[in-house]
Amino acid sequence: MKVSKLWLREWVNFSLTEQELAEQLTMAGLEVDAVNPVAGQFTHVIVAEVLNTKPHPDADKLTLCEVNINKDKPLKIVCGAANVRPGLRVALAMIGAHLPGGLQIKESKLRGELSQGMLCSATELGLAEHSEGIMELSDEAPIGMDLREYLALDDHVFDIDLTPNRADCFSILGVAREVAVLNKLPLIEQPIVTVPPAIDDGLRVNLIHSEACPRYCGRIIRNLNLEAKTPLWMAERLRRGGIRTLHPVVDVMNYVMLELGQPMHAFDLSKINGEINVRYSASGEQLELLDGQEVVLNDNVLVIADKEKPLAMAGIMGGANSAVQEQTQHIFLESAYFNPVTIAGVARKYGLFSDSSQRFERGVDPCLQSKALERATELILSISGGEPGPVIESFDKKFLPGTVSFLFDTTKVKKLTGLSIPLNEMKNLLEGLGVVIIKETNHFFEVTIPSHRVDLQQDADLVEEIIRLYGYDKLQAQPMQTSVQAGLISAKEKIATHVSSWFSAKGYHETISYSFVDPELQEALYPQKEFMELLNPISSELSQMRAGMWPGLIASMIYNSHRQQTAVKFFEIGVVFDLDGGQLKERSCIAGLLMGEQGNLNWSESARLFDFYDLKGDLQSLFASLKLDDVEFIQSSHHALHPGQSAQIVINGKHSGWIGVLHPRLSDAFDLDQDVVLFELNLESLINPTIPLYKPISKYPQIRRDLSFLVDRQISAMQIERVIRNTVKEDWLKSFDVFDVYMGKGIPEDKKSIAVAMTLQDDTRTLVDAEINLTISAIIKKLENEFSILLRE
């Protein structure tokens, strides 16, 4: 934001030097990058009037001029500018004048004709980078007056780098508010005249998407003077604000934006068909912009349109098809409030940048639109004349930002900064910002935030405002005085930490993968699920939210296996996303996989590959560390797992996950030549709500009994274990292990032999053989009844 010091002083009468003001603004958070004079250094340049002209007798491109400088005798000047003419008031460098670049003006003869000075262009005076012809001054410019005084060129421009939260300072008014409160000076409000309508003409405004544009003000002005030109004072202020002049109407739009902070736009009324519609564009609509670029719009770009076509990209740039031009006689003025979320990012997406988009992205004052429209109308009428219609205002209160009010705890100033500031001083600083203090109760202020400060939403924001206005330099190094409460760690966080440490200790490597996955891989693993598609993915290979942990783990495993990793042990803890009836639900999971050789080369045993039981054993060990006793592995089928080597994991009677070997079909598709064993569990299922109780180690002997059964092949060891545990007296069965499974010679084809070992123990006494024998008999009888199992001798 470029701010003229003299323009700023019209709003607040300060007496600071340029350096002092720059330091003050920077310390208050408005960083001043540079302070530059508004014009080059020159002397003895005055306002003069061209009385008459005639061609140079010896040069076709030179003109002989008589110039009035309000002295007894006019001066003779030789000029080469094409725009020199009688009656024109110009900038004359007198004999002895020094111009930028070291040029000194002397009396001389050009092609034999006397020249007693030089008529200057804006470029020669350092007032513009490019200019055509000599500088043309207003007809009211006082002849003989020093040009620096007439144009107020003893001025400086402050180039301020604004942080994203200070959208309110994108105007002279906004910076003036800061200077006023910093120096405890009154803000000089500039009156805005309400212009009464001279005609009844208006346009219908339809807020089709009012959530994106909740307020739109407009006004027709007819019969502009086509000969009008932007006054020099306005052109100079625009130049100092970094904006070049284009057309009187457009210049007024830019002037009001610099002055008040409200971006505006003017349309050629003759190019508008019937009405104004504020809507999102249809995909594929095209619009040629003011800069000549033609853009193809997608369906999320807010546009200003008439009945048949888009006229402008709302808040970003107008269209060439409705632009104000030299022959434009009737105009429609726009002053609107656009939701910052709607504008943010759209300009960058299309490679566009404008002063309007910069302001709308950060948020303008939602109450400023009608005031800015009245100010623009007043200026246009004073420059170009015309007949204004009534102000048209359409709004949707539901989507307009509401008044922000809350209870401010003033003790937080001391808590957060360590600085003790009197309550009265805090009150004065806040009121200087425009904050209304409705009520004071003890150390609380009930406050209402002004509409232009969209960044003030909570206590911490007001603390920041108070301390920056009070002065960061008044902060002294001292220990902070505050109360600290230890944060509570949730049960899920504790489980995640335990599981991560446990797997790491087991030699697993933790992976962290994207929550976005390859849709082909995910759909191959979970064909029965729905998936959330990303609207704007990083790439086509990462276009779905993951519905399980396996896609990321398998992708990491494939990457490593293709790089000669002979043993892969991975686990990952993360969030998966289930799509349930169109609603996205998050779920925390733990998953892992094994592939390759188990262990290192060893002289005492041969190498082997990881199998189902390696991973199952690791999980059983994990469950034991978490004191989870009610865990079952129930043989079941999963689309991604081997039909004969897959199981559901049931914890405390609830389905909690899966374990198994990757389906051969998928192994072939992924070009894997070894089995991949993997599991996935809901993390919350590992939370054990029971409180562990102290229990001494039993001093009574353990008794082992081995039993061998002949069972149908489809009967699992888990089913046998469940029957045994339900039969043995509570707390007697200390362990249950399957130590042999045999199918083959001597065993019927539809049968198998399972041998199990049971360890029995009572914690209060020694078990006797009679009790043990009764228990074994009960087990055998129960198994015979349930599964027709036979005890092998």
From Swiss-Prot:
GO terms for cellular component: phenylalanine-tRNA ligase complex. Residues 698-792 form the FDX-ACB domain. One of its GO terms (molecular function) is tRNA binding. Its main location: cytoplasm. Mg(2+) binds at D455, D461, E464, E465. NCBIfam families: pheT_bact, YtpR. This is Phenylalanine--tRNA ligase beta subunit. The gene is pheT.
